[in-house]
UniProtKB/Swiss-Prot annotation:
Protein's recorded name: Complex I assembly factor ACAD9, mitochondrial
Annotated source species: Rattus norvegicus
Organism domain of life: Eukaryota
Pfam families per UniProt: ACAD9-ACADV_C, Acyl-CoA_dh_1, Acyl-CoA_dh_M, Acyl-CoA_dh_N
UniProt membrane topology term: Peripheral membrane protein
Organelle transit peptide: 1-41
Cofactor names: FAD
């Protein structure tokens, strides 16, 4: 099938198809490097030290005019396909994506968006991948199917596969002839990936591994030809002892011994294929080890960390469509002889949805822009923050939209209840938001701990100079010192109309850095067990990154004269003010003796409930005698 034959109905469609085909040729003629290794320091990690690293963040990343023109030409036919060819209601009701729809997705090249051109893919940058994700998000089941295939299913081959593995597997995966799945989760191991029980045993002749075990909730599990599978293997440690360590494998269905259960009947994303996958004496050649034997945990984390940023642009695309649909309803629906749009509580909901969409979009494209830079930084924390913020905002905004729509939002005749069902999974997959908050906080604290080790040792030992310096800092802070981290005082970095918000960001970052030092001094290594503390640290950091993203983006929009940049100023300032006060409250909660800190009460209440495994308060109608 020709790549764009689906658009060839009539002269206009034919012209669109021709334009899109030219774009595709340009894409495949130009080589784009897909970065696969981490190099320079993360922007987010520096926030833990009270620093704002401007490089790569200010000004907001831009794509070239040529790239922008190309991607915009590609966007048109893709939007046309999703608007006219994809029946999301049917996909949801029937619980599967029709074969002809899958075929058209393949013909569009959507199964190889980030596969390098030399292996038959489009080789698009992270930013272009994010832009296409906005459109693909028009259908959640398709979004999940494509993401499971390339963001995690085949991503390991791109990141750590050797040349032979890439040449063998990527061409058919990029064309969609083969579909990929990522097999990590097991019945007894969800977030605790290291506890998997699937085992791969090396054969006596050392030519292959024998794979046995079961994986659950595998997206594309019933469709896939190629699986990235994680299993325990015996590894000889440096001291000569034998230990079980996780190893990643490329497994073909044709290797045999692979079966899958029936598709799961799910709450949302019902058209995606999710099922159990079982491996029974599956013989995997040693050449199909992905990365190093025993290095599977690192491979899994690199795969998951690399793609999370795209959830921000995908959810933003969904929310923009949702705002458009609900705004039309609010402006035409009358109650009390007035349009719904005239009521303050309805207006508040639209402001919230617009703000959330703007922030997540800014965070996603800031992250993709950093990833696309030469010598790009480690953006694993940033990508995780985008995922947490956008998934929670999606759930909140769709819920608010249903509130605007009233009964209509609850009916299956309209798409809104489906959007609510589809949104719920976002908080769970690609790492639950609880686990990601721990990852965000602990990764940054580990970085700060390495930098501050000597200072913390001096404070613990009572070094007079260090102690007096710390007391002096706290005294200056208590007197309301002016914080200048190079944003609010430099109009070349942040536009003056955003100056007050920039100052709020600087102040938050400064005191966050101080608080991090205090937490490391107070808890030391035991901080890994302080999940309520870590949650607050992560929440502050997510807000700081969101503030940074909107200030950088809005400043760029003002300077280059983008339309409606005054609207961006409103959204950016509104978010920064709200985030600033949220951060102040969270910072106060991190003080063990502050009245805002209810950690001990929270732990005691939950302990009493879980001991009885029940709600233990007496019924309000009960009597003591």
């Amino acid at each position: 099938m020709s790549g764009y034959v689906l658009f060839s109905r009539g002269a206009t469609a034919a012209a669109a198809a021709a334009r899109a085909s030219r774009v595709l040729r340009v894409f495949t003629e130009r080589r784009r490097t897909l970065h696969t290794s981490l190099q320079s320091c993360s922007f987010a990690k520096e926030l833990f030290l009270g620093h704002i690293q401007q490089k790569g963040v200010f000004p907001f990343p831009e794509v070239s005019q040529e790239e922008l023109s190309e991607i915009n030409q590609f966007v048109g036919p893709l939007e046309k396909f999703f608007n006219e060819e994809v029946d999301s209601r049917k996909i949801d009701q029937e619980g599967k994506i029709p074969a002809d729809t899958l075929a058209k997705l393949k013909s569009l090249g959507l199964f190889g968006i980030q596969v390098p051109e030399e292996y038959g893919g489009l080789g698009l940058s992270n930013t272009m991948y994010a832009r296409l994700g906005e459109i693909i998000s028009m259908d959640a089941s398709i979004t999940v199917t494509l993401a499971a295939h390339q963001a995690i299913g085949l991503k390991g081959i791109i990141l750590v596969g050797n040349e032979e593995q890439k040449a063998k597997y990527l061409p058919k995966l990029s064309s969609g002839e083969h579909i990929a799945a990522f097999c990590l989760t097991e019945p007894a191991s969800g977030s605790d990936a290291a506890s998997i029980q699937t085992r791969a045993t090396l054969s006596e002749d050392k030519k292959y591994f024998v794979l046995n075990g079961s994986k659950v909730w595998i997206t594309n599990g019933g469709l896939a030809n190629i699986f990235t599978v994680f299993a325990k293997t015996e590894v000889v440690d440096s001291d000569g002892s034998i230990k079980d360590k996780m190893t990643a494998f490329i497994v073909e269905r044709d290797f045999g011994g692979i079966t899958n259960g029936k598709p799961e009947d799910k709450l949302g994303i019902r058209g995606s294929n999710t099922c159990e996958v079982h491996f029974e004496n599956t013989r995997v050649p040693v050449e199909n080890v992905l990365g190093e034997v025993g290095g599977g945990f690192k491979v899994a984390m690199n795969i998951l960390n690399s793609g999370r940023f795209s959830m921000g642009s995908a959810v933003a695309g969904m929310l923009k469509k949702l705002i458009e649909q609900t705004a039309e309803y609010a402006c035409t629906r009358k109650q009390f002889n007035r349009n719904l749009s005239e009521f303050g509580l309805i207006q508040e909901k639209f402001a919230l949805m617009a703000q959330k969409a703007y922030v997540m979009e800014s965070m996603a494209y800031l992250t993709s822009g950093m990833l696309d830079q030469p010598g790009f930084p480690d953006c694993s924390i940033e990508a995780a923050m985008v995922k947490v913020f956008s998934s929670e905002a999606a759930w909140q905004c769709v819920s608010e939209a249903l509130q605007i729509l009233g009964g209509s939002g609850y009916m299956k005749d309209y798409p809104y209840e489906r959007m609510l069902r589809d949104a719920r999974i976002l908080l769970i997959f690609e790492g639950t938001n609880e686990i990601l908050r721990l990852f965000i906080a602990l990764t940054g604290l580990q970085h700060a701990g390495r930098i501050l080790t000597s200072r913390i040792k001096e404070l613990k030992s009572g070094n007079v100079t260090t102690v007096m310096e710390t007391i002096g800092r706290k005294l200056r802070d208590s007197l309301g010192r002016t914080v200048d981290l190079g944003l609010s005082s430099n109009i070349a970095v942040v536009h003056p109309s955003l100056g007050d918000s920039a100052n709020k960001l600087e102040e938050n970052v400064h005191y966050f850095g101080r608080t991090v030092e205090t937490l490391l001094l107070r808890f030391g290594k035991t901080i890994v067990e302080e999940q309520l503390v870590l949650k607050r640290v992560a929440n502050i950091l997510i807000n700081l990154y969101g503030m940074t993203a909107v200030l950088s983006r809005a400043s760029r929009s003002i300077r280059i004269g983008l339309k409606n940049h005054d609207h961006e100023i409103l959204l950016a300032n509104m978010f920064c003010v709200e985030a600033y006060f949220q951060n102040l409250f969270s910072l106060s909660q991190l003080d063990k003796y502050a009245p805002e800190n209810l950690d001990e009460q929270i732990k005691k209440v939950s302990q009493q409930i879980l001991e009885k495994r029940a709600y233990i308060c007496a019924h309000p109608l009960d009597r003591a005698s």
